[in-house]
Amino acid sequence: MKMVVEKTEKFDPEEVIEEFEVLTKDAGKIQEETLQKILEENGGTEYLQQWGLNGKTDSLSFKNCIPIVTHKDLEPYIHRIADGDLSPILTGKPITTISLSSGTTQGKPKFVPFNEELMESTMQIFKTSFVFRNREFPVVNGKALQFIYGSKQFKTKGGLAAGTATTNVYRNAQFKKTMKAMQTPCCSPDEVIFGPDFQQSLYCHLLCGLIFRDEVQVVSSTFAHSIVHAFRNFEQIWQELVTNIREGVLSSRVIVPSMRAAMSKLLKPDPELADTIFNKCSRLSNWYGLIPELFPNTRYIYGIMTGSMEPYLKKLRHYAGDLPLLSADYGSSEGWIGANVNPELPPELVTYAVLPNIGYFEFIPLMENLDGLEPMPVGLTEVKLGEEYEIVVTNFAGLYRYRLGDVVKIKGFHNGTPELQFICRRNLLLSINIDKNTEKDLQLAVEAAAKILSDEKLEVVDFTSHVNVSADPGHYVIFWELNGEASEEILKECCNCLDKSFVDAGYVGSRKVHAIGALELRIVKRGTFHKILDHFVGLGAAVSQFKTPRCVGPTNLSVLQILSSNVVESYFSTAFC
């Protein structure tokens, strides 16, 4: 059963909820039907034929024939498609668009097939979470201040349109129709969203938000990082924005002709609005509650706030004041997994109900068998409450039994479908010896050490890590960018706290016997992490899709170079001396 994307500008919320309830009540049956449909559409492809599926469409034959794979296994097939091979390689119907992952995890963007079925899944997820969100936090005839940035699409060697997953969505006509149907159209014109320069687009987004300040009911972005980044910038440029509004003249920093032309239609002299914004900003204490002061009718802040976005929540709450933070849905460049149908939960507790008709899902239990082999994956309706799994996806765009690399925990069930909590990326491990520390472990260590800074009214702007094995024994390196100057004494204390906060038994044991060297804390110049963002944007990533890499591997030389060349101070832990 596939939800039909409506072509009209209004949709019935009750109908969307009813369809969701029907889908989730019989999740097991819907999963079998979804797999059958995927295999019927693509049974004649080179990939499925080579594994001897021979037109079978049942799940047992599928699992017996088709291996579990990573992106590396499918890369040669995807590159042939991108290079113009029109034969049915992964899908029966030709792939016309390629999505690029952000590339922040592995250091370079991955190519992923994108098609109209994935676009339909996107709109289904958006609508489903919206109707649940709108029951709790209704918005009516408002606008959304969306910090979204559509990078340029380009043509692959074979003439396919290629762009980041977010760009492919934003450029699709269905996206704008759906936003309009949700009564939260973006307050920025397309010329700003698709502008060629991120800093100029950000400036115009903020200006559009201020012009429509009374109509803004939602402040959002793909990721929480982009919202925090936008308002950190606002702190620096707010007086210039006020002057633009007072005089009705756009700043000379915006030089893209199409952007200037679009903004000139919106910007008119408004001294009264300029005075209001000036007075509100002048009265704020350390910018606390900035968002509701600027946009008084805002109902909530919306974006992906889990995983690598959690470290930005403290600053986001500072800007949001009493406004609720609502975490957006769960997906990746490869496709969507689930919708947030419990919007009242804070980001730290948010769960995602898997939509059983947008793909076929399997779950690898995160425990080794006694013989050391990885356990067999289980189906969507076979997962157990409280257990952790890695997700395996089969979708309508040519990915079959594809390891997503995400670790999730089963927190409950909505009818027959599980509600997942995102835990971490499985492959983001700090490991030298027998130690194994995940992104979550790193995050907890940074949070513990950052509490020492907060007493000094300082904060960690951003952070990442690296395993240095150039010397023996190897050691962990943590890079911090701070919002001010910290004393040597404080930073030494932070360094020791970081080292002691990794509580993994393998790490602690290895540190005690000096099989792992002392943890190193390196402080980098202000703006270093912005240089990393610029680097990935230069590679073709969209700002809206950017995630700071939490662990920089040895092959990610460009990012290591940016970090290393901007180090201003370095400290080694004395915790295990």
From Swiss-Prot:
Binding site residues for jasmonate:
S102, A328, D329, Y330, G331
Instruction: Kindly list the residue ranges recorded as spanning the membrane.
Output: none
Quote the record's binding site residues for an L-alpha-amino acid.
Answer: T166, T167, N168, V169, Y170, K531, I532, L533, D534, H535
Q: Which GO terms describe its biological process?
A: defense response
> Where does the signal peptide begin and end?
none
> What GO terms fall under cellular component here?
cytoplasm
Enzyme Commission code: 6.3.2.52
Q: Name one GO molecular function term.
A: ATP binding
Q: Which InterPro entries match?
A: GH3, GH3_C, GH3_M
Q: Quick one: which residues bind ATP?
A: S99, M119, T122, G163, N168, G331, S332, S333, E334, G335, W336
* Upregulating conditions: Induced by wounding. Induced by oral secretion of the herbivore Manduca sexta caterpillars. Induced by treatment with JA-Ile.
Q: What is the superkingdom listed in this entry's lineage?
A: Eukaryota
According to its UniProt record, which reaction does this protein catalyse?
a jasmonate + an L-alpha-amino acid + ATP = a jasmonyl-L-amino acid + AMP + diphosphate + H(+)
Q: Which UniProt keywords apply?
A: ATP-binding, Jasmonic acid signaling pathway, Ligase, Nucleotide-binding, Plant defense
Asked whether the UniProt record includes Lipid metabolism among its keywords, one would answer no
Functional summary from the UniProt entry: Catalyzes the synthesis of jasmonate-amino acid conjugates by adenylation. Catalyzes the conjugation of jasmonate (JA) to Ile, Leu and Val. Catalyzes the conjugation of jasmonate (JA) to Ile to mediate defense signaling and resistance to the herbivore Manduca sexta caterpillars.
Q: Which family does it belong to?
A: Belongs to the IAA-amido conjugating enzyme family.
The identity of this protein, by name, is Jasmonoyl--L-amino acid synthetase JAR4
Q: Which organism is it from?
A: Nicotiana attenuata
The gene that this protein is the product of is JAR4
